[in-house]
């Protein structure tokens, strides 16, 4: 079977209204993909930058897949959270990106968004915190339902990923 190695890191995030951020991430693939090694979900530590607009995580990503075809190419979905001084967590944004299908090292920016909610929810969020969240993470990377949501743009997540393709020609899988 053809193999794909995804190696890299979630560098950090910038452009968010508050510091003290962490990221939950996961990788979604189609049914023809088999994980050979690594983990497909995780969470970074909380970073509270003192003098910088960017929270740094340097969280490693290392996965090895076998596949029979390109259908269901991996998608990375991200959730950026803010942790306040009392240890309460508030969702700051969702994001997803397709893992590049070309071999090599890629520097990526993934813009984030969050559901806007009704005006009552927005007022409640200003005073109490929290805010609307998606019921299912599949809406982040899924089909057209995501485009019906009213959202507001948040910051962006910085990533560096290296993609290594192996045995694609041998098994007749064309990636270009």
UniProtKB/Swiss-Prot annotation:
GO MF, any single term: gamma-tubulin binding
Record GO biological process: cilium assembly
Pfam families recorded: B9-C2 (PF07162)
Keyword Amino-acid biosynthesis among UniProt keywords: no
Primary location recorded for the protein, binned into one broad class: cytoplasm
Highest taxon above the source species: Eukaryota
C2 B9-type domain segment(s): 2-118
Keywords: Cell projection, Cilium, Cilium biogenesis/degradation, Cytoplasm, Cytoskeleton
Protein's cellular compartments: Cytoplasm, Cytoskeleton, Cilium basal body; Cytoplasm, Cytoskeleton, Cilium axoneme
InterPro entries, per the entry: C2_B9-type_dom (IPR010796)
Gene Ontology CC annotations of this record: centrosome; ciliary basal body; cytoplasm; MKS complex
Subunit structure: Part of the tectonic-like complex (also named B9 complex).
Family statement drawn from the similarity comment of this UniProt entry: Belongs to the B9D family.
Role of this protein: Component of the tectonic-like complex, a complex localized at the transition zone of primary cilia and acting as a barrier that prevents diffusion of transmembrane proteins between the cilia and plasma membranes.
Protein name as annotated: B9 domain-containing protein 2
High-level lineage: Eukaryota, Metazoa, Chordata, Craniata, Vertebrata
Underlying gene: b9d2
């Amino acid at each position: 079977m053809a193999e794909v190695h995804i190696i890299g890191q979630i560098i950090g995030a910038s452009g968010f209204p508050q510091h003290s951020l962490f990221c939950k991430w996961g990788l979604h693939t189609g049914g023809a993909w088999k994980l050979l090694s690594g983990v497909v979900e995780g969470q970074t530590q909380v970073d509270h930058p003192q003098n910088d607009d960017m929270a740094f995580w340097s969280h490693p990503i290392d996965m090895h897949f076998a596949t029979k075809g390109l259908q269901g190419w991996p998608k990375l979905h991200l959730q950026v959270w803010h942790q306040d001084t009392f240890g309460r967590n508030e969702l700051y944004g969702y994001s997803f990106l397709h893992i590049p299908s070309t071999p090599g090292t890629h520097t990526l920016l993934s813009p984030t968004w969050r559901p806007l909610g009704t005006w009552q929810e927005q007022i409640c969020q200003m005073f109490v915190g929290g805010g609307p969240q998606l019921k299912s993470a599949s809406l982040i990377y899924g089909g057209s339902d995501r485009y019906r949501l009213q959202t507001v743009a948040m910051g962006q997540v910085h990533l560096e990923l290296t993609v290594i393709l192996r045995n694609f020609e041998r098994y007749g899988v064309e990636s270009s």
